[in-house]
Amino acid sequence: MGLPKLSTPMRSAGSAAPPVCRLIALLLCTATGVPAQITPVAVGPIVLVVSDLDRAETFYTQVLSFRTAATREAHEYSFDRLTGVFGTNVRVATLELGSESIELIEYRTPRGRPVPPDSKSNDQWFQHIAIVVSDMEAASARLFQFHVQPISTAPQTLPEWNLNAAGIKALYFRDPDGHPLELIYFPPGKGDPRWHQGQGKRDGPFLGIDHTAIAVADTERSLGFYRDVLGLRVVGESLNYGAEQDHLNHVFGSKVRITSLRSSSGPGIELLEYLTPRDGRPSPTDTKVNDLWSSQTTLIGREFPASVQELLKRKVEFISPEPQETLPLGEKGARGVLIRDPDGHFILFESASDYHER
């Protein structure tokens, strides 16, 4: 399948607020204490849209050692309002690996479109989760044992001249629906210290989720959103290029500006700007949240009404016409809104009233 036909241009983060935003403003007009900047509590689960929940759950649990924590079904009008997709009937599974979790969602109705088979790592709908491993050779051998579709030619070790990333080993591959995933190994002195603690307590090499990475067209524009609006902090930067990078992401001649952001807990978010080549395609402007390429990131924040007011003030693009209960996604009792970043990536901004450390 080629790219879906593009429709109207995507609204940038600085354009006029759409009618749904004006409706939210009316609903939240009594909020006080609007923060100058949102302070997120955590980056929550990454949500992957799958075509067959049973198949996807089997892949993640049997191949990658995730554990199924919960499954549920829903066909609520409130979920239609949250997602901007009418007539939803969904199945959701929450899967855990270490301290992190992902949510797999199958839209039984309406069915979304598949991931374009010619998708590349520099296309701007690209989003992966990075799974930390204690032993790259053992982890990659397990993938090959299950005939997993690779993106990388083989596991790559980043070169010594790249001081911020030297010695890190990584491998890109795909799940059964074509979602890109990454295995990542941190040598001593690199990565979060927790990845080097208690590794012997796990049966296999898969430890947890370090970050989700998204392709962006302009790092500075994206920092204006993720750092300046959403309140994430920059914790690292790197410029990756050379044969190892080309073979890792399977993009010839790639020079990638990588910016790492974090909240107080949960996985990080990495911005990937391909300085070369510049032929990555923008996300289709008619993308819906049930399309399989439309992964979404959960961001959990306090002072929810005031934070939503701040998003409105910053003219962020809203999908939800007003805050809704997020179930079957997220925490029980949580409310949220679905928004888009400047490149079209979806974010579920969720209230933190019932949040607890995962």
Residue ranges and their predicted role:
Residues 21-33:
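Bacterial N-terminal signal peptides
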Residues 83-85, 118-121, 162, 203, ...:
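Short consensus segments that form the blades of beta-propeller domains
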Residues 37-38, 41-51, 71, 90-104, 108-109, 115-207, ...:
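Vicinal oxygen chelate
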Residues 49-99, 138, 145, 164-166, ...:
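Core segments of cupin and vicinal oxygen chelate
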Residues 54, 58, 62-74, 109-110, ...:
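Extended intrinsically disordered, low-complexity coil regions enriched in Ser, Thr, Gly, Ala
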Residues 1-18:
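N-terminal secretory signal peptides that target proteins for export/translocation
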